[in-house]
Every structure is written in structure tokens, then in C-alpha cells.
Design a protein with these regions (language model features):
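C-terminus-biased signal that marks the final domain/tail of proteins
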Residues: 21-195, 208, 296-473
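Cleavable N-terminal signal peptides of Sec/SRP-targeted secreted and luminal proteins
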Residues: 3-20
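Generic detector of short alpha-helix boundary/capping microenvironments
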Residues: 5-8, 156, 253, 293, ...
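Internal mixed beta-strand/loop scaffold within catalytic domains of large alpha/beta enzymes
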Residues: 184-291
Length: 473
């Protein structure tokens, strides 16, 4: 069995292309467009609501009537009012997600511990294990994952905004879970980053002239985490100690940072950037999921989001993709992918790929598509040796939108197993929409082999409809 942790370690290798043309696909891709499923558009206002002070929850169906996929049958959409401050926000969120949190939070870290140990001791993954910080490996092998995570919490806590610690304590109290477990859960991404695909298309690269941004999260499906998808929406700002912008985060119960998120004007996502941890990496800084959350919680343009990432005290090396409203482009739309580490931030735009990745021209890698309004990185080590995403971008340029990304790009590239999302911003600013997909099985109790998100139906939700659930009786 290959766990999500092992998948992350071996994602540093390039994925071999398939020479034969897949049915309904391009020759460089392993998957098939025929694997795609319909996109659902539920009426959120019509669902039964669970209400608590400062929050509301609806269960959004994941199972179309014409499919046999049965588990999970829904995902929780929790909308919380932040105007009472971080602690009350956390209490409301914890109350809304209590059952999910009690099942997930105490079990996630033990579930992953054995897989990390096996990966670190397996000679097949030895060189990839070296991409982990040496102090983490030492702490893990001596005292286990809890010790390694406690060290991470200690290193980052000084730089973690108090508002997030207060919200975490509120969540613990509201859900009835241990604060220490939440601290360890929220520290986990700092240790092992996921392999992902990022595509940001704007203007002439798209079918509508707006922005379509893909975030595909690849982490494997052998860990318990796949059973607990959550979408959380924050609305009703408290500018003194909380965000000033309504935003949505695709996450897991008790994970209060963000790795997939958007507001009405911009969206953000991340991908592992594998490099020697001794070079410009540190854990003495703000955990990157909280930096990502701050971008959509406080800012409304690509440029302001980029500047915030530059100004933050960063930790480990990651890619961060920010797309949406832009003050520097001719059409008011745009996006870029940041290569960030503890010391530097490099901006990859639609014109400078070969400056950012000069190795692309010297190592025999496939030619990366450079066209106006398009930036992307696939799930492999960059510069990628896999031509699938390049071929898909070339094939779909000028037609990119949520339907193409979900039903053509994702299943052919086989990316987005743990979750995937598309953020869309209308060219005229009239609508902002999120599409989300999650894994599932074809049995009622989740005991079967999970089907990756990229082969399941996605759900379309308008952000105004999401935020409106709080006031909709």
C-alpha cells in the first residue's frame, strides 16, 4: 500500500508519459476525458439547515442520481459569522463540525505515523526522505510523530497570529476535541507538503474572458483524511482581530489554515516545491497555510496578495498561485505563481517562465507553453519532465473554463485525488463561483477503494449564495 505520505515523497519524481492515446484524451496523458462526471448545481437555500449562534451548516449532496458512488453522500458546508471575534467564530465552527471533528482530529496523526516510519525506512524512498528536514527525521525516529510535530508547533507558535490560536481554542471547546490535537493537525502541512497542480487562466486564455483557476490537491487516498471533506465560509468581518473580506476555504475538520481558498475577487492555492531543506528553508516563521488564508481573508487584488506573501515571515518552500482581479493588467484580470521560501519570493507570470526555470531549456524537458493570460505548474517536480499538462493547455488554450478544467484536464492528467477546486471570476465582476470535487466509494460505508476526486462529480456554488445562507431562514 502506498500512503499519502509516501505519495508526497515520491512525487519528487517525474510521472512517465503514456505513449498510447487514452480513450477520449491526448497521447501524452495517462487518464481519459471519459472518466469525467457531470457537474451538479444544487440550490443551497433549499437544504435543511443546522443552526448555532454565529453559524449555519448545510450538507451538500455529492451523489448524483445517475451514479453508484455512495460514500460520502455529502460534504458539510459551514458558514460562520466572524463579527464576534475569533474565539466565538471557532466555537460556532466547532459546534457545526463536532461529529466530523471527533471522528477525524484524534485519528489523523496516529493514522499517518506508521506510514511515515515505513517511508523513511524504505530504501526506495531514501533520497526523497532527504527532502524532509533532518531535525524532523531525527525527532520522528527517536520519539515518534507527536514529538516531531510538537517541535514544529514550538518553532512556529511565536509567529502564528493570536487570532488563529484563539479560533483554534474556540473550535476545540465547541467541538469537544483537544486543543493539543488541533495544534498538531495544523502543524502537519509544514512538515510534508502535498503535490498539486495549479492553472490560472485569464482573459484570452479562457472561454469567457474572465478568470478560471484550477487547484488540484494530490496526497493519495490511503489515509483517513479523504473521508472528511469540509467547505467553510467566513463572513461578517471584525477588522480589529479578524479578516476584512468574506472568503471560502476547502479544508478538513479542525484545520483552520487554508490550502484552497477564494473570496469574491481572488483565489489562492499551493503546491509543494521540493528543494534541499538546508537551502533557504526554516520553520521559524508563520505556517504557510495561515499566510495563504490571510491572502483571501484580507486582500482583494492579485497585487496586494502577492505583496502580503512577500512581506510575511515565510517558512518552507512552496508554490502559491494567486489569480483574479488585478490592478496592473490591461483587462483588470490576471494571476501569477509565486515560488516562495524562507528568504526569497520569485514571481512566475505569463511571460517569464524560462527566466524562472532556465533548466527547462537545458535538461530535455518538454516545452512549457508560454501564452498570454496563462500560468501553470503540474504535480511533478519543476521544471516538469511530463508533457501531459503542456499538451492539455495547448489543446484548450482560449477555451479554458470550469467545465474544460474539470471534465478534460483533471481526469486526463489524473490530478486532484484528495480534492480539487476551480475558482471562476466573471470578466465584468458580476459573479464569483467555486466548483469543488471530493473522493468517494461505491459502497455505503466507505470501506471500498476510494475513487479520486478527479473522477467524481463536482459541485458548483455561487459565493453570494454561500454567504447568504447565514441570513436565509
Amino acid at each position: 500500500m502506498v500512503s499519502g505520505v509516501v505519495v508526497v515523497l515520491v512525487m519528487a519524481t517525474a510521472i512517465a508519459s503514456v505513449s498510447a492515446t487514452a480513450a477520449g484524451g491526448v497521447s501524452d496523458c495517462a487518464g481519459s476525458a471519459s472518466d469525467a462526471k457531470p457537474i451538479m448545481e444544487p440550490s443551497l437555500a433549499g437544504f435543511e439547515k443546522m443552526r448555532v449562534p454565529n453559524g449555519v451548516r448545510v450538507n451538500v449532496p455529492l451523489t448524483p442520481t445517475n451514479t453508484t458512488v455512495a460514500f460520502p453522500s455529502h460534504f458539510p458546508l459551514a458558514v460562520v459569522d466572524t463579527s464576534g471575534g475569533p474565539y466565538k467564530t471557532g466555537v460556532a465552527l466547532g459546534q457545526l463540525l463536532a461529529d466530523d471533528a471527533k471522528a477525524f482530529v484524534p485519528n489523523f496523526i496516529p493514522d499517518v505515523a506508521a506510514e511515515i516510519e515505513a517511508a523513511l525506512k524504505d530504501s526506495r524512498y531514501e533520497k526523497y526522505a532527504k527532502l524532509l528536514p533532518s531535525w524532523f527525521i531525527d525527532a520522528f525516529l527517536v520519539d515518534g510523530i507527536h514529538a516531531a510535530l510538537r517541535v514544529t508547533v514550538w518553532m512556529t507558535k511565536k509567529y502564528t497570529p493570536q487570532r488563529y490560536l484563539d479560533e483554534m481554542q474556540g473550535f476545540a471547546d465547541g467541538a469537544g476535541v483537544e486543543m493539543n490535537d488541533l495544534l498538531l493537525l495544523n502543524a502537519f502541512p509544514e512538515l510534508i507538503k502535498a503535490a498539486c497542480t495549479i492553472v490560472i487562466a485569464s482573459g484570452e486564455a479562457t472561454a469567457t474572458g474572465g478568470v478560471s483557476q484550477l487547484r488540484a490537491l494530490d496526497f493519495g487516498l490511503d489515509l483517513v483524511v479523504w473521508k472528511y471533506p469540509v467547505v467553510v465560509a467566513y463572513t461578517g468581518s471584525n477588522a480589529e482581530d479578524h479578516g476584512t473580506v468574506d472568503f471560502v476555504s476547502v479544508t478538513f475538520p479542525g484545520f483552520l489554515g487554508s490550502i484552497t481558498g477564494m473570496n469574491r475577487n481572488i483565489g489562492i492555492c499551493e503546491k509543494a516545491w521540493f528543494m534541499d531543506p538546508a537551502k533557504n528553508d526554516s520553520r521559524f516563521g508563520q505556517p504557510f497555510p495561515f499566510t495563504i488564508r490571510e491572502v483571501v481573508e484580507f486582500f482583494s487584488t492579485v497585487e496586494d496578495g502577492v505583496q502580503h506573501v512577500k512581506d510575511s515571515r515565510r517558512t518552507c518552500s512552496t508554490f502559491m498561485g494567486i489569480g483574479g482581479r488585478s490592478t496592473s493588467s490591461n483587462n483588470g484580470l490576471g494571476g501569477e505563481i509565486l515560488l516562495t521560501d524562507h528568504v526569497n519570493v520569485t514571481e512566475y507570470t505569463d511571460t517569464n517562465y524560462h527566466d524562472v526555470f532556465p533548466e527547462n531549456q537545458t535538461k530535455g524537458t518538454p516545452e512549457h507553453l508560454v501564452r498570454p493570460g496563462l500560468v501553470y505548474v503540474d504535480k511533478t517536480l519543476q521544471p516538469s519532465h511530463d508533457n501531459c499538462t503542456n499538451a492539455l493547455m495547448d489543446e484548450s488554450y482560449g477555451q479554458l473554463d470550469a467545465a474544460v478544467l474539470i471534465q478534460n484536464v483533471l481526469p486526463q492528467a489524473r490530478t486532484g485525488d484528495l480534492h480539487a477546486a476551480v475558482y471562476e471570476f466573471a470578466a465584468d465582476g458580476s459573479t464569483s463561483t467555486i466548483f469543488v470535487g471530493f473522493p468517494g466509494t461505491d459502497d455505503a460505508d466507505g470501506s471500498g477503494k476510494p475513487i479520486p476526486a478527479y473522477q467524481r462529480s463536482f459541485v458548483r456554488m455561487d459565493l453570494d449564495a454561500i454567504f447568504g445562507l447565514l441570513s436565509n431562514k
